[in-house]
Amino acid sequence: MVPPREDVTVRIVCERRRTAGKEARPPPSAKPTPGNTSSHPNAKETHRSNEPFFRLYTKQSHRRSIMASTLCVVLGSASSTDPAAISAATMTDAAAKTIHDAIYESLELVVVASELADVYDSMELSRFTKILSPNATVSVSVIGDATKSLSPIHTSFLLAGLANNSERRNADGSRTLTATRRNNTTNSVATLNFASNNNNGNDLLIDEDNLLTDASNLLGAPPSMSAAATKSGDDCSGRAPCDDCTCGRAEGAKEGNSEQPKEIKSSSCGKCSLGDAFRCASCPYLGKPAFKPGEEHLVLDLQDDF
């Protein structure tokens, strides 16, 4: 049942204030001179009492909407077998001719396929939803060979808030698109699924043993340091000794630093790094490529193994 619409009628009444019966009035012979309003002691008060004022009356009248079954609108040069169909040139004209006091259960629009882009406006269909009841059906019949895109009709359904239901192709090549108005009620209730609140306190507990595991081996030494530590028998994974070391690793590190550096081979000419063109006959790097001074240990060993 559609609730009745309330129309409010406003009536403005202009009245004049009337002075009290006991109020003294000036005699007819005593007329105030222009510019002088003090000829009578109550002249100013009498002028105020005759000022008009307004009263606002409201009257509410209930007018029930007319419930109708189907509204048929023919656009452009299309035709319909419904004698009560409304003919209009465009969607804008059809919206202006519609009886807005009635509520319809279904709306039928008829348009020729060749005139779809000219007479059908996607924005105007939303104006018809005001006269449709909840769950009302809206159908658009495209007469003729509807080989062109029907995207304007689908767009109008979307802008009007309609749910697109179906599209039917007839034997003569015409198409009928159907949509339904959603029943959006203000008293509808949506169910919210909340997660179960398990306040047993176990989520706040942390296992200390899990914090000590290193599954990704992030706490270990780099591979190069580990290989060097394994080769030298170091059990500290190549890390520097502690300041208060008691395992003897600090003494071993000091002895390792006190070792003499390896002797670097060189000749008397001092031009070993420049290449064979500058080296002498007794150069130990004869036959090897040139290198930077101090990088003798990086020189490739190009000698034969035989």
From Swiss-Prot:
**Keyword Cytoplasm attributed:** yes
N-terminal SAM-like domain, as annotated region:
59-190
Q: Extract the ranges annotated as region (Linker).
A: 191-218
| Alphabetized GO MF terms | 2 iron, 2 sulfur cluster binding; 4 iron, 4 sulfur cluster binding; electron transfer activity; metal ion binding
Q: Give me the residues that bind [2Fe-2S] cluster, please.
A: 236, 242, 245, 247
The short sequence motif called Cx2C motif 1 sits at 269-272
- Name where it mostly resides: cytoplasm
The transmembrane segments are none
Q: Where is the composition biased (Basic and acidic residues)?
A: 1-25, 252-265
Cell location? Cytoplasm; Mitochondrion intermembrane space
Q: Where, in this chain's numbering, is [4Fe-4S] cluster bound?
A: 269, 272, 280, 283
What does the record give as cofactor? [2Fe-2S] cluster; [4Fe-4S] cluster
Q: Which GO terms describe its cellular component?
A: mitochondrial intermembrane space
User: Motif span (Cx2C motif 2)?
Assistant: 280-283
Any Pfam family from its record, for instance, is CIAPIN1
**From its record, what is one biological process in GO terms?**
iron-sulfur cluster assembly
The ranges of region (Disordered) come to: 1-51, 252-272
For this protein, the record's InterPro entries field holds: Anamorsin (IPR007785), CIAPIN1 (IPR046408)
Query: What's its job?
Result: Component of the cytosolic iron-sulfur (Fe-S) protein assembly (CIA) machinery. Required for the maturation of extramitochondrial Fe-S proteins. Part of an electron transfer chain functioning in an early step of cytosolic Fe-S biogenesis, facilitating the de novo assembly of a [4Fe-4S] cluster on the cytosolic Fe-S scaffold complex. Electrons are transferred from NADPH via a FAD- and FMN-containing diflavin oxidoreductase.
Which HAMAP family does this UniProt record tie to the protein? Anamorsin
Its domain description in UniProt is: The C-terminal domain binds 2 Fe-S clusters but is otherwise mostly in an intrinsically disordered conformation.
Could you say which protein family the record assigns here?
Belongs to the anamorsin family.
Subunit organization: Monomer.
Entry protein name: Anamorsin homolog
Which species expresses this protein natively? Answer: Phaeodactylum tricornutum (strain CCAP 1055/1)
